Structures are given as structure tokens and as C-alpha cells.
Amino acid sequence: VHFLSLQIFGCGAVAQVTTSYDTKGQFLSINLAFAIGITFGVHIAHGISGAHLNPAVSLAFCLIGRFQWSKLPFYVLSQIIGAYLGAATVFAQYYDAIMSYGGGNLTVTGPTATAYIFATYPAAYLTTANGFVDQVVGTGALLLCLMALVDTRNSPAPKGLEPALVGTIVLVIGIAMGSNCGYAINPARDLGPRLFTYTAGWGLDVFTAGNYWCWVPLVAPLVGAILGCIIYLLFIEIHHSRKEDEKQTNERGNTEYDIDLDEWKPNKRNLTTLTASDKVHIINNPFQEGQSENSDWKKSSCNEECIVNRF
């Protein structure tokens, strides 16, 4: 459902602009449609999948230990299928317009090409190497910004505004980096529609066009996503100072607390900040070290067991 929203809005905008000969929208309207589609896609899917719409993001989060490897194949498959179905929906909606624009032909290149409505293709001047760099930079920028949005120690996104901010990231990437090859920055967003165009009648040209361009939007975003995560971890995240009762957000949006039982002063105010969906990581545990005479804990009506059992 979430990927359908992205493809229908984004590719639908490209179809409208293309088949109307730019009389019903321009490049900016395409960028806005993809950005708003991403916004609602994230909003729709956040509670179910953590809003994983992009295999590059999912893979990068697996590599840094913030997503489960066992889930990755199923997420990627669903993302590609969703993109395929989204492209099919746009084709069905704009079938007459596409056939009229192409003179009854489904072509990949030339003045009446329509394959780029669904998948990305390089500009005539773009080399494969330059296109690869373009996609690495664009996806790296995406991950760098996403990492900041979910970093609870670095002014994280206000609760409820995450979808809009993710959409804003996509918008600015499109405005700044969209002219070379359509800023796929997402392997599924390109592969799903490309597979659809192949099965719908555009033929093998969808894979061979642009000097076999099809592999670039599959591989380059993966490289860019990994680099974006590494850059954020090395230059930002590892420099955060760890604070008592530090909050960290896990993949489902719940809150995790690191509590040093040897130093933390339990009181009613502290305990009421914890909710049933939160998790506690016990560190420097005096109970396990035989230091159960800790006066602060003896005076408290709660101990380690009551905290752990609550969660």
C-alpha cells in the first residue's frame, strides 16, 4: 500500500506532464508529487513496517545493526512488488494518453519515448560513471539526513512530523540532483517499474538503453546508502556524549533507556516517565555485583526487579 502511494503519485505526475507536452505541469510538479507521495507513504506504513520504502535504506540499517537481516528479503520483495503494481496502475490510468503520445507505439528512446514515465534513464550527455556518482551522492545525502532525523541525541524530528521531513528530503534531492538521470535513489522504485515496462510491451530496450543503464539505479543507491550511514556514524553519532537516562529510539518507535543502577536515583518522577512500550537496558548493576546495600535503592519502593518486570 505505501509503495503504491509513492508510485501512483510520482509516476502519475510524470505521465501527466509528459503526455500533456508540459502544459499540465513541469519538472517541479514532478518533484512535488514524489515528495508528497513519499510523505504519505511513510505516514501510512510507519506503524506496520517502520516505513521501509527503500531497499538501500533497509540494507544500510541492517549493516549498522538497526534492522533485522531476517526481514530484509521480505521487505525488499514487497517493495519491488509494490513498485511494479504502482507502475501498472499508472499505465492503466493513463493508457489512452500514453498510446496517443507515442503514436500507438511503446518506445524507450526517441522524441515520443514513454518508458521514462516509469523508470529512470540517463540524459543523452551522461556517462555511466558520472551517473553512478550521481546516484551515490543522492542516496548518500538521503541517508545522511535520515540518520539525523532518527538520532535522539541530535535534535530528532518532532513526533508526527517525520513523514513530512522525509518528503522534504526527497524534494530537495529532486530539485538539486534530478536532471542527470531522474534521482532514483531507490533500487525498488526503479526495478519494479522497469520490470513492468518490459512485461507491458516496451521490450528488452528497457534494459539495454543508455548503455545498459539499468544496473546503475540498482547498485549505486546501495553504495550511497552505506556511505551515507558510515559518514554520519563517524562524523556525528560517535561524538555524542552518553547521558544518564539517555533515550534511544528502536526500529518500532518505542523508547529505550540506558539506566545505571549504581548511580541512578530512583524516584516517583523518574519511574512515571517510563511507559509500557519502553525498554530498559540495565548497566553497572549493583545487584548482580552483590552490592544490594545501595542506600538509594533500599529507600526506594522500587528495585531492579520491578523495573525489568514492568517491561
Q: Which ranges hold each PLM region?
A:
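Membrane-interface helix-loop junctions and terminal tails of multi-pass membrane proteins
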Residues: V1-F311
